[in-house]
């Protein structure tokens, strides 16, 4: 298989250059993790590579692209909603897949008058040795929790639609998989299965993920997008962390030297008369270039969050013999739990077992079927749910936060302006006046999280907070939660995040909470 070569790829969206003259090579059987702060163009790069979006210029930057059949897992699947799950998953034009689809349809709607046709299909499957593929189809569907194959995809939840698209991509006749956040809406066991499946698939993979264990286990190389450029690192995520730290040390040392030189040149500039000789112009030009480099700072922004919180009393949250049922299905039964001020509770379990229900009962958006949830009088809850609520996308970024506060008081007593806070949280000044609707999905979640924290909560409820957040933001969030004065309850499938944040685990298993 030829290498997929990309040379001097440039892409602009409106007046923003997303990436400029980036070049890289994708080798056969590579598994490349694509990382970068939200808004740097990770999804845009996958769009361009897949052909969903175009590139700048008239000359193609791609070599040997036609050797690759690309399967693309997007964040928002575009399906024919009238088609069934079976027809959607098995949409490949591969003969074996077509036979499997026909076989499954006959088995779903079996009658005696279809027996002869069924036998004919089975004989063809025998001749093409398609039963191994059929077994793989069954395994993929089972592992992803896709059961009712006759349901129209238009009737599925967002999470199930994503799993259907993931199955479609995994089972398609592709040799290059572009996967945008493949672990979203998957539980831990399914993520572990997916890791092994991709490792054994003999396919080339380029993927975006916030799940650092998944990234570490799967990747053989890391591509990092930053400030319209792309940097490559050999190895997995742990290798990237080590190599990046070494590079940051070199960058810091170089910046220090430039700052010292800038001070010397600034003193020289101040000593010179306004009408400078032409022969000095080259030195003057170098001074202005140096000024730009020094004012740009180091490559990585040091993100910090240290917000003042409201006081919390001894009584926080208590579940007293709480039961809850949904459509006659018991979710909680005589459940008791005392949440104390310093608790860091991770909530885990399969999809649909009631993890989010627990948070909704605390938030008051659901009422128990029996028992009661007692909330302390001083409790002030911030609920970071999977669906962003109350985010008026017609507003401008800085105005959205200034409606809550003009400045932020930290736990140390100092104050920070909203503009400075936005910069610390990776919103450059150029974005402060932008409409929220122009932000990426991850940037919107980051902005929403900032708003919640500005409201000075003393209890945090987090429902899958790592979805759509970049790794840099997750690191800051983890550090913030470790220093947060009140209790934190978080539903998450992100094992790395839970290991860093949670000191207790509530596990939904076999209809019980352990």
Where are these regions (language model features)?
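Phosphate-sensing "switch" segment of ASCE/P-loop ATPases
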Residues: 301
């Amino acid at each position: 298989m030829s290498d997929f070569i990309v040379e001097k790829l440039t892409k602009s969206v409106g007046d923003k250059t997303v990436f400029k003259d980036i070049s890289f090579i994708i080798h056969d059987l590579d598994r490349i993790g694509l990382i970068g702060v939200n808004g740097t163009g990770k999804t845009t790069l996958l769009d361009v590579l897949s052909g969903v979006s175009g590139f700048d210029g008239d000359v193609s930057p791609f070599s040997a692209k036609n050797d690759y059949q690309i399967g693309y897992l997007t964040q928002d699947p575009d399906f024919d909603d009238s088609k069934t799950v079976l027809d959607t998953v098995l949409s490949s034009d591969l003969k074996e897949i077509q036979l499997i689809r026909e076989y499954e349809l006959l088995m779903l709607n079996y009658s005696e008058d279809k027996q002869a046709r069924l036998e004919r299909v089975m004989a063809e499957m025998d001749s093409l040795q398609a039963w191994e593929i059929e077994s793989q189809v069954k395994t993929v569907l089972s592992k992803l929790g896709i059961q009712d194959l006759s349901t129209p995809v238009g009737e599925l939840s967002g999470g199930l639609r994503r799993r259907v698209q993931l199955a479609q991509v995994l089972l398609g006749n592709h040799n290059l998989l572009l996967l945008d956040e493949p672990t979203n809406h998957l539980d831990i066991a399914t993520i572990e299965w997916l890791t092994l499946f991709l490792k054994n698939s003999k396919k080339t993979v380029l993927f975006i993920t916030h799940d650092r264990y998944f990234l570490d286990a799967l990747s053989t190389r890391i591509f990092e997008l930053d400030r319209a450029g792309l940097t490559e690192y050999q190895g997995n995520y742990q290798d990237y962390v080590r190599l990046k730290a070494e590079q940051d040390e070199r960058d810091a040392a170089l910046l220090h030297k430039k700052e010292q030189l800038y001070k010397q040149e600034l003193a020289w500039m101040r000593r010179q008369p306004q009408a400078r000789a032409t022969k000095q112009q080259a030195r003057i030009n170098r001074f202005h270039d140096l000024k730009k480099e020094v004012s740009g700072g180091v490559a990585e922004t040091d993100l910090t969050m240290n917000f003042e919180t409201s006081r919390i009393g001894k009584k926080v949250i208590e579940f007293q013999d709480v039961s809850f049922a949904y459509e006659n299905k018991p979710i909680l039964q005589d459940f008791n739990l005392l949440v104390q001020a310093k608790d860091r509770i991770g909530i885990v379990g399969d999809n649909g077992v009631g993890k989010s229900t627990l948070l909704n009962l605390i938030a008051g958006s659901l009422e128990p079927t029996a028992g009661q949830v007692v909330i302390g009088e001083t409790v002030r809850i911030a609920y970071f749910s999977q669906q962003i609520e109350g985010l008026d996308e017609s507003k401008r970024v800085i105005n959205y936060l200034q409606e809550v506060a003009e400045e932020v008081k930290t736990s140390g007593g100092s104050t920070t302006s909203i503009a400075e806070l936005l910069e610390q949280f990776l919103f450059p000044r150029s974005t402060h006046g932008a409409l929220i609707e122009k932000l990426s999905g991850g940037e919107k979640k980051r902005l929403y999280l900032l708003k919640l924290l500005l409201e000075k909560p003393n209890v945090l409820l987090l429902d899958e907070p790592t979805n759509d957040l970049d790794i840099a933001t997750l690191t800051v969030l983890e550090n913030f939660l470790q220093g947060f004065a009140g209790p934190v309850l978080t539903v998450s499938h992100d094992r790395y995040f839970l290991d860093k944040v949670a000191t207790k685990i509530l596990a939904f298993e076999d209809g019980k909470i352990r």
